[in-house]
């Protein structure tokens, strides 16, 4: 499946982390989501109902990030991915949760986890490099 919808750089304040100060003060998280879905019907019909609504995707992802604190960003990414996979039209999803202000003492640009889900292989199935599903 080559068709996909990409949401990049969704920035949301959340309270996720292992340390108490992360869960109290919170910090900025950046979310990237790629949804593999057949877009042929949407292209032919020109109807929002025939595609995956990226406005709703952004809204739900933001709700999850801003929601209850989690110790691990892996959990946050999995919640977003599982929500996307609730839509049976979706073939696969990849969610990257970036934590650019993570409490790492060394200088770094970013740290992220990437969660992938697919109908073909279920949880943890790896989408091949280049995104072909």
From Swiss-Prot:
Family (UniProt): Belongs to the DHNA family.
BP terms from Gene Ontology: folic acid biosynthetic process; tetrahydrofolate biosynthetic process
Active site: 99
Species of the source: Mycobacterium tuberculosis (strain ATCC 25618 / H37Rv)
Binding site for substrate: 22, 54, 73-74
Swiss-Prot/TrEMBL catalytic activity: 7,8-dihydroneopterin = 6-hydroxymethyl-7,8-dihydropterin + glycolaldehyde; 7,8-dihydroneopterin = 7,8-dihydromonapterin; 7,8-dihydroneopterin + O2 = 7,8-dihydroxanthopterin + glycolaldehyde + formate + H(+)
Entry superkingdom: Bacteria
Alphabetical list of Gene3D superfamilies matching this protein: 3.30.1130.10
Region (Targeting peptide): 119-133
GO MF assignments: dihydroneopterin aldolase activity; isomerase activity; oxidoreductase activity
Known EC number: 4.1.2.25, 5.1.99.8, 1.13.11.81
Sorted UniProt keywords: Encapsulin nanocompartment, Folate biosynthesis, Isomerase, Lyase, Oxidoreductase
One GO cellular component, as annotated: cytoplasm
Additional facts recorded: Was identified as a high-confidence drug target.
Protein purpose: Possible cargo protein of a type 1 encapsulin nanocompartment involved in protection against oxidative stress. Catalyzes the conversion of 7,8-dihydroneopterin to 6-hydroxymethyl-7,8-dihydropterin, 7,8-dihydromonapterin and 7,8-dihydroxanthopterin, respectively, in equal quantities. After longer incubation times the only product is 6-hydroxymethyl-7,8-dihydropterin. Retains aldolase activity when encapsulated with a slight decrease in rate. It is not known if this protein is normally found in the encapsulin nanocompartment.
SUPFAM superfamilies per the UniProt record, alphabetical: Tetrahydrobiopterin biosynthesis enzymes-like
Description of its domains: The C-terminus (residues 119-133) targets the protein to the encapsulin nanocompartment.
Pathway: Cofactor biosynthesis; tetrahydrofolate biosynthesis; 2-amino-4-hydroxy-6-hydroxymethyl-7,8-dihydropteridine diphosphate from 7,8-dihydroneopterin triphosphate: step 3/4
Protein name as annotated: Dihydroneopterin aldolase
Subunit structure comment from the entry: Homotetramer in the absence of substrate. Homooctamer in the presence of substrate.
Compartments, as annotated in UniProt: Encapsulin nanocompartment
């Amino acid at each position: 499946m080559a068709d996909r919808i990409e949401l990049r750089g969704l920035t949301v304040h959340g309270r996720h982390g292992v340390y108490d100060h992360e869960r109290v003060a919170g910090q900025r998280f950046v979310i990237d989501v790629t949804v593999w879905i057949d877009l042929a019907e949407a292209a032919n019909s020109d109807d929002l109902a025939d595609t995956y609504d990226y406005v709703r995707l952004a809204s739900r992802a933001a709700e999850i990030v801003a929601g209850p604190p989690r110790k691990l960003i892996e959990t946050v990414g999995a919640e977003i991915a599982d929500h996307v996979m609730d839509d049976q039209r979706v073939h696969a999803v990849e969610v990257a949760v970036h934590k650019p202000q993570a409490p790492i003492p060394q200088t770094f640009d970013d740290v992220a986890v990437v969660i992938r889900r697919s109908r073909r292989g279920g949880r943890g199935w790896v989408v091949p490099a280049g995104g072909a599903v």
